[in-house]
Amino acid sequence: MASATLTRRWVLAGLGAGFAAPSLAVAQTATTADLVAKAKLTGTSGFCVADVATGQILDSFQPSAPVPPASVIKAITTLYALDHLGPNHQFTTQVLATQPINAGTLAGDLILSGGGDPTLDTDSLGEMVAALARAGLQKVTGRFLVYADALPAVGRISDDIPVEAGYDPGVSGLSLNNNRVNLEWTKGGATAQMTAPGLQYLPVVQGIKINVVDRDTPVFTYSDQGAERWTVSRAALAKEGSRWLPVRHVAPYVAEVFATLCAMQGISLPPPLMISVLPPATPLITWPSANLSTILLEMLKYSTNVTAETVGLAASGARSLPASAAAMQDWAAEVLGLSATLVDHSGLGATSRVTAEGMVRAIMAGEKRASGAGLRALLKEISLKDEKGSPQIGGPVKIHAKSGTLNFVSGLAGFMTLPSGRDLAFAIFSADPARREAVPIEQRERPPGQKAWVARARVLQNGLLRHWASLA
């Protein structure tokens, strides 16, 4: 049942100004409720806006309705990671050796060790290999060991996403290219290959197989038969092109790319061997990531799921994704006062639930903590749109927020600074989980009706923001 909240601030204003102010308060509530009705969204919509200085709720509609947060939950993951790891935390990737290099040969073991860096890419790996070549390494006669157990191996984030979705990859202590591999093909699928492209390097990936088949649907199939195997419909490859596909077994993929880059530099390696415990060894190369605050800034801007899961797992120290999500859920309840059900750190899982009021109170509480004081600066700045839908770039109202989208789910939460200097915190959610569940998994990349539904949800969000921007 729809509900509207009038705060003590509105009541006191009414008592001080006779009968006019209460009418104004009722008019405001009716206006925002009318915006919800005008959006004609199926499912549930709820919102909440509060004064940051006082914590008073100024306007709300179904603020306690549980809804999937989608990627909006990355704001909570950001607070969690900052609290547990600190803004200056760096993830390191290392190449180590158990013996010195002698006349170009390493008679001992060479170890590629991942420290959980979610931003490692092919060019970074290539620079590490180039440094090995400059150090004189030409051949390894011992073993090539690969350590990725700094984080647990996760095959995929959510199992109700189309198998080919590049935003649903595996998670590992050793990551590369957001844990995706690039499928490239020529016209009609005459040739197709997997690559791990960077700007400076283009290694071909042989360990993940691709086969072009003569069928119309499904476009992709995936199987795991000792190696990752994909098939793709020839009908879908009419024009030359490429697309990213998710990698499920991440560490072997990174190991292969590393070995290929070594070969390109004239360094010969034996086949890789995965290990779960690092032996005593001397670092040859140490590659640090950017500071965590920079990683989180990029994560919030591009809504990178694998980054959210990686930093969440690093923060919790848990050995499975469900356990890690539960740890963040408990922390958010205890520290931020957020009552939620969380199944991951990215919001990709559709069974997570938050409320609009809970989200508002959580981000306000988080920003007041020393560890979360920089949250607003990390959130993406967005612009209000005018009645024609054109962004009002550089306008007097400053908004920093995190958006989130799943099939028939759309959310936005963050902070507004009004021209008067007044700070507001807000959360807006619309969701129709039943409609989402009715869509077959293989159709969930572009389900019928999704685009129009999300467009209406975003019109609602902008309308609410425009309305709240007029508050004194």
Functional labels for PLM-detected ranges:
Residues 147-209, 351-395:
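A conserved catalytic-loop motif detector
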Residues 209-374:
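A small/polar active-site loop signature that marks catalytic segments
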Residues 25-69, 87-88, 126-135:
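Beta-lactamase-like hydrolase cores
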Residues 83-98, 270-274, 372-376:
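Short, well-structured active-site flanking segments
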Residues 1-19:
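N-terminal secretory signal peptides and thylakoid transit peptides that target proteins
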Residues 316-430, 435-472:
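Small-residue-rich helix-loop
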Residues 44-46, 103-175, 179, 315-358:
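Mid-domain, small-residue-enriched loop/turn segments at the edges of structured enzyme/sensor domains
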